[in-house]
Amino acid sequence: MQNNEEPYSKTRNSGQHPSGVHTKKSPRLPKCARCRNHGYASPLKGHKRYCMWRDCQCKKCSLIAERQRVMAAQVALRRQQAQEEELGISHPIHLPIAAELLIKKEHGGSSSCLMLENSSTQTTSTPTSGSTASSEGKVLIQEIPSITSRGHMESTSDLVMDSPYYSNFYQPPLYPYYNNLYNYPPYQMAMAAESTSGNDMGGISGPPLKNNHRNHPAAYVPSQSGNQWQMKNRENRFPGHSGSSQFRMHSYYPPYLGQSVPNPACVPPFLTFEEIPSYSEAKASVLSPPSSQDSGVISLSSNSPVSNESTKAVAEQEPNSESSLFTVTTAAENGE
């Protein structure tokens, strides 16, 4: 080895200049390490392909190759960490451990038991180095928000039971007082309601007139669209209006139908003006007392003399219902 180093030392000494002669140092040029190990000094630039000891397997050259592999691995690791920091991913090495813990949580009974199991496994496991201990601490930090964020992880059946409530939130089964979303007949836009006897009578006649105007269904409200009033019997009653008058609610009509704008062209009359009895008979049948069990279909067209103004006048007489009924019945008897 001494003989090999001699020419290298000679070339090195020959390249030096006396201190008093040169005023500026020459730039340092990297030399080939493999050639240096074998006693030759050759510049590294453009020499890698043509190096004579490129495939040398001696001890020094093998150490050089191992060092190059380690440095390449470190560079690749630094690039990977930089990319993960840009993407917001932290600790990629511990992801399989976190996935196993999540699988244990899903198959376990409750979150408290899972926390105890995880803590027991981590206390029993002896860390071999400081890096493993720090990784376990990081996994513990990642477990806590995962358990709190999941909320009801104790039983997944609760989530399955809650899903139909949110999916069928506006469906008819949740609202027993409504037949459909708008609650109007599909073929005729006449305002419909039932005519029953006793306390089931929800119309404008009888003792329910003493209650507030909110108890009247939308079939008897004169401000709705059209002048036709339709009364259905018990066989054709709607399922949404089967309750008593105090539990009934208004039927909803969409705003595009209009409120107080009659449209006789779109709503065909149920009966003609000739088929309807006289004015007094129609008024007596509409304002009949609750004791009379008049069932059937009575529809007043837009050409009938009973207009919205007369119905509004009748609706305004709610405080004096008994006196108004008495005067109406006497007027009907005098007319007959």
Curated annotation (Swiss-Prot):
Keywords: Activator, Developmental protein, Differentiation, DNA-binding, Metal-binding, Nucleus, Repressor, Sexual differentiation, Transcription, Transcription regulation, Zinc
Keyword Transcription tagged: yes
GO cellular component terms attached to this protein's record: nucleus
Region of interest called Disordered, as start-end residue ranges on this chain: 1-28, 117-136, 285-336
Tissue specificity statement from the Swiss-Prot or TrEMBL entry: Expressed throughout the embryo during early development, becoming restricted to the primordial gonads in stage 52 tadpoles. Expressed exclusively in the primordial gonads of both ZW and ZZ tadpoles. Specifically expressed in the somatic cells surrounding primordial germ cells in gonad at stage 50 during sex determination in ZZ and ZW tadpoles (at protein level).
PROSITE patterns tied to this protein: DM_1 (PS40000), DM_2 (PS50809)
Location of the protein in the cell: Nucleus
A Pfam family recorded for this sequence: DM
GO BP field: cell differentiation; male gonad development; male sex determination; male sex differentiation; positive regulation of DNA-templated transcription; regulation of transcription by RNA polymerase II; sex differentiation
UniProt feature, compositional bias: Polar residues: 1-17, 318-336
Highest taxon above the source species: Eukaryota
Annotation: DNA-binding region: 32-79
Alphabetical list of Gene3D superfamilies matching this protein: DM DNA-binding domain
Principal location: nucleus
Ranges of biased composition (kind: Low complexity): 119-135, 295-310
GO molecular function: cis-regulatory region sequence-specific DNA binding; DNA-binding transcription factor activity, RNA polymerase II-specific; metal ion binding; RNA polymerase II cis-regulatory region sequence-specific DNA binding
Membership in a protein family: Belongs to the DMRT family.
Free-text function comment from the UniProt entry: Transcription factor that plays a key role in male sex determination and differentiation by controlling testis development and germ cell proliferation. Acts both as a transcription repressor and activator.
Protein name in UniProt: Doublesex- and mab-3-related transcription factor 1A
Gene for this chain: dmrt1-a
